[in-house]
Amino acid sequence: MQQEGFRGYFLQPGHLDLQRQHHQLNIAYGELLDVLTASKTAVEGTYTAGDTVTYVVTLRNTGTAPLAGLTVTDDLGSYAFGTSATLYPLTYVSGSVNLFINGVLQPTPTVTAGPPLTITPVTIPAGGDAVLVYQAQANEFADPSQGGSIINVVTISGDGLAADATATATVTADAEPQLAISKSISPSQVTDNDRISYTFILQNSGSAALEATDNAIITDVFDPRLSALSVTYNGAAWTEGVQYTYDTATGLFTTLPGALAVDAATVTQSVTTGAYTITPGLATLVVTGTI
């Protein structure tokens, strides 16, 4: 989002004294124009817990003189919590700042991680531009639930400015399933003709459920191959050809589209610290067979 240039006015009355005669002259009007424009964008439009967001701040000097020694301050998405606390949902990624002046990479300015994050000095030549690229990580104070967002404001200040310039970028919480899967075997030691179980745990850390219409599938090759399969999903028996297929010749096991569904994660925010906790939605697939 771009900050429009500040426009202000001043007036200067004139006085003339001639041999003890006081004359009021006309009043001259002048206009103060802010020659700095600022915009800020987020490369990634969405985030999940722990994600890194890349920000690009573009500053343009439309004046005829350089703007020297500017300070760029990023509020890292600060918001009020409770009666007096301020929380920061972003953590600056150390060493990520790059400064370009008219497209040329510059030595890294002084960076204070904060919060808030400050970058100084930034000098923009007359008619030129400066581009700052840096990263921040969504931390435990970033709302991961559906409808969550981080509103991030950058402020540019300095003696050469008629007023501070600001620009804003907003990223929203990802509203998709975030799946992880683990596999275990029981018992761990078996002999021929023993029964063995493979347990698959599906975890959904996302703010949206995995629906049957998403047509997610699991495939696995059992080696050694199994026979006389029995399959359950969340404790309910599955039927071969309806929820899964199994090739006894190759050991290939495949769930069929529409068979898998996993609840969305549950999100809670501590009333004491303001930190968010994610409890993943879970589903359990158990495949049992004879070696």
Where are these regions (language model features)?
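Exported/extracytosolic protein signature
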Residues: 1-291
